[in-house]
A protein has these predicted regions:
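Catalytic-core regions of core metabolic enzymes
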Residues: 1-536
Length: 536
């Protein structure tokens, strides 16, 4: 249940607020203040009357009615605090940062169950427990850093792991990737990855909402809902990429000890992602690189031109693209010779286009214009430009900026010199661009995207598992050990597994009529003895 009070709270209380910004209760209050939250902010601390300039109350029973409560107190104290806040203070959204719940012990799981029963009874949202929090442009209710640049058209990040969410943000910020929201669902007692996707799907506004979703998943509790809502969002124009951690036996065990996650078959995960149209990634760098690619204009083909002033990176990028089934076609003929004549002697235009270390911003502009207007066999351009620190790159990156604004073909900026050209890269990112610092990671990520299937064309239905009916069917099966076909069909339907239509008849005309109605091909099978060879 995702309430408006979670997304846009008019008032927030931090229970366990602290003046020590190195504690979760202090760090989250600091982030709320520095993030410019404009609603009413309250703190609960039994030893202070004021915390970081915010009025503090000794007990939750003393605060006014509040929309959102953030709990940074020991796990054992959380159930009673949630009960008081929901029952007496009209709180409709909770973020529980505390650990020590179902991810650790049975006793902790009991505490979680009590909290869940309370929030459900009062119609409140629950993020966590065991999470870093939630943030959007309205409020930064997280205790971690970095806080990324937030923008309505930025990326939505949903993560099972708080630490992984932080490390994904670290990776993304250096690339210039902006965010719309960050969801750390932790133990996902009430709200998990599937619930967030469902909310985004059911409330999707194509005019205002982010179209990019990045997921880090440790457990898929409801594969049907994940498939249904992910594919629905993609069909509405969204792009989704995900890491599913815990694919190995050891990894599954690690995930279980981390957030109490339940293992999923990796082959089943692969099939689900492919059917939904989700781009599967295997590392944080890959995920954020895919996210950056998603922000650029959509590719219309698989043919790439590479423009560089350094031969080695161009070769490695060519290899990475080729391994992924993408093309770096040879550029030749009169147009290529014409371009070569405008570059310094020794430059190469066969693709990669190498303008040499002495190449100028004007040479880069020329190459981009030729790739856009004159090379018909090129669908997109990769531009690799760094520096050993001998010259500045401002003019070169200004050319990239100008061309990216107007070019009819996507341009992928690969600016590897994030130290020696740090100021230039920062200025480039400040203009709203992203940067791919590593050409091989970019090539691999592009291959993932280009080779990911679209969502299944057939309508995906949200099937439920009817456990009571399954039990009745099993109980009705004869004790001789043979399960007749109609029992199998009933079990599959009750388990929510789609099956093809069947028809049993001993009449030729009826069989032909059925085939014409359903369409070919049709499989014919004898109904009768278990061993068909007994009857010929």
């Amino acid at each position: 249940m995702i309430t408006s009070q979670l997304l846009h709270p008019a008032s927030i209380v931090v229970v366990g607020a602290s003046n020590n910004v190195h504690k979760p209760g202090g760090a989250i209050l600091k982030n709320l203040l520095s993030g410019g939250y404009t609603g009413e902010l309250r703190a609960v601390n039994p030893k202070e009357t004021e915390v970081q300039g915010v009025a503090a109350f000794a007990d939750v029973k003393d605060i006014p009615d509040t929309d959102l409560a953030i709990l940074a107190i020991p796990a054992a104290l959380c159930p009673d605090a949630v009960e008081m806040l929901a029952a007496e203070k009209q709180v409709k959204a909770f973020i529980i940062l505390s650990a020590g719940f179902g991810e650790e012990t049975h006793e902790g799981a009991v505490l979680e169950d009590r909290i869940l029963e309370t929030v459900n009874r009062y119609g409140a949202s629950l993020i966590g427990p065991n999470c870093i929090g939630f943030m959007n442009s309205w409020h930064h209710s997280v205790f971690s850093q970095p806080i990324p640049q937030l923008h309505p058209q930025g990326v939505d990040l949903i993560s099972s792991s708080g630490a992984t969410a932080v490390f994904i943000l670290e990776s993304a910020v250096t690339k210039g990737l902006q965010f719309n929201s960050v969801w750390s669902v932790g133990n996902a007692k009430q709200i998990g990855v599937e619930d967030v996707l469902q909310y985004m799907d059911e409330h999707f506004n194509p005019e205002a909402d982010s179209r990019i979703k990045l997921l880090y998943i440790e457990s898929i509790g409801d594969p049907d809902r994940l498939l249904f809502h992910a594919s629905s969002l993609i069909k509405k124009g969204c792009k989704i990429a995900a890491i599913k951690a815990g694919s190995s036996e050891s990894g599954s065990r690690a995930a279980s000890s981390h957030t109490g996650a339940i293992a999923s078959s990796d082959s089943a995960v692969e099939a689900l992602f492919r059917k939904a149209g989700i781009v599967r990634c295997y590392s944080r760098e890959e995920l954020t690189t895919v996210g950056c690619i998603f922000t650029l204009p959509e590719l219309k083909g698989k043919n790439f031109a590479i423009i560089t002033h350094a031969g080695g990176p161009g070769v490695m990028l060519t290899d990475a693209l080729s391994k992924g089934g993408l093309n770096v076609p040879k550029l030749e003929g009169p147009v290529a010779e014409e371009l070569k004549g405008k570059l310094f002697p020794g430059a190469a235009v066969g693709n990669p286009i190498d303008i040499l270390a002495t190449g100028t911003p004007e040479h880069l502009r020329l190459c981009l214009e030729y790739c856009e207007e004159k090379f018909d066999n090129i669908d997109a351009v990769m531009a690799i430009f760094g520096t050993p620190g001998l010259v500045t790159m401002f003019e070169m990156y200004d050319v990239l900026h100008e061309k990216m604004l107007h070019c009819k073909k996507p341009i992928f900026p690969i600016l590897p010199s994030i130290n020696t050209a740090g100021a230039e890269v920062a200025a480039f990112l400040a203009k709203g661009h992203v940067n791919f610092a590593d050409e091989v990671t970019l090539g691999t990520a592009l291959s993932r995207i280009m080779n990911a299937p679209r969502p299944a064309n057939n309508e995906i239905e949200l099937f439920g598992v009817d456990v009571p009916r399954i039990r009745r069917i099993i109980d009705s099966i004869p004790a001789d050990g043979y399960i007749a076909p109609h029992y199998v069909q009933a079990l599959l339907r009750s388990a929510g597994i789609p099956i093809v239509e069947e028809f049993v008849s001993d009449n030729k005309e009826e069989v032909l009529a059925f085939a014409r109605r359903t369409g070919f091909p049709v499989v014919a099978k004898v109904v009768g003895p278990v061993h068909k060879s007994d009857v010929g």
